Amino acid sequence: VEAQYSITMDDSQENKTYLSYNRVVGDTLDEMLYQAFDVLDYALVSSPGAPVKQALIDAGIGDDVYGSYDAGILQPVFSFVAKNANASQADEFESIIENTLKEVVKTGINKEALLAGINSSEFKFREADFGQFPKGLLFGLNCLDSWLFDDMKPFIHLECLGTFAKLRKDVDTDYFEKLIQEYLLDNTHGSSVTVKPKR
């Protein structure tokens, strides 16, 4: 998919393209997936030296690479994004992501990165550490992530301490590698998007 965004006449069009690789991940009522992909975002792209981010930076694709996990919709979307890339790098961007993910599945994810991701998520939850946002507001929004789609499950994303404990145990299994294989590599419900600047 290709799209455009507006820039001013004074802005350069060179290396101002956004590239994204997006996959739909289950549904928001699955509390394990809801937390697991937040952890995978950290382990694959957000942490220092994360494999997908490092591979894209080493290839010179974009001047910033980040992940996004949008779980506030019935079918959550997990994305890898390269900012300020070149449109001609779109195929290489997708290839590097897929090859890096295949290597991660084959050799295993860094267990320390997974544990750090779990610890970070659990700390934020326990301490209600949401930065500048009031905790009541964020708790309410977390309730809406499930409540909008099932009136009987408004609190599943607030009752997550058991989920964190289970994820901690799953670090020593191939659970996370299977998630990558199923939802990021074998999954055809997704898109690759190139957004180019236009004056």
Per-segment meaning from a language model:
Residues E177-I180:
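Conserved functional hotspot residues or short segments at active or partner-binding sites
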Residues T173-D174, K198-R199:
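Extended non-catalytic domains of envelope/secretory-pathway proteins
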Residues N15-G26, K53-R168, T188-K198:
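M16 family metallopeptidases and their MPP-like homologs
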Residues N15, L29, L33-Y34:
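Disorder-to-helix initiation segments
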Residues V1-M9, Q13-K16, S20:
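Hydrophobic, small-residue-rich alpha-helical packing segments that form membrane-like cores
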Residues M32-L44:
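Active/ligand-binding-proximal structured segments within catalytic/core domains
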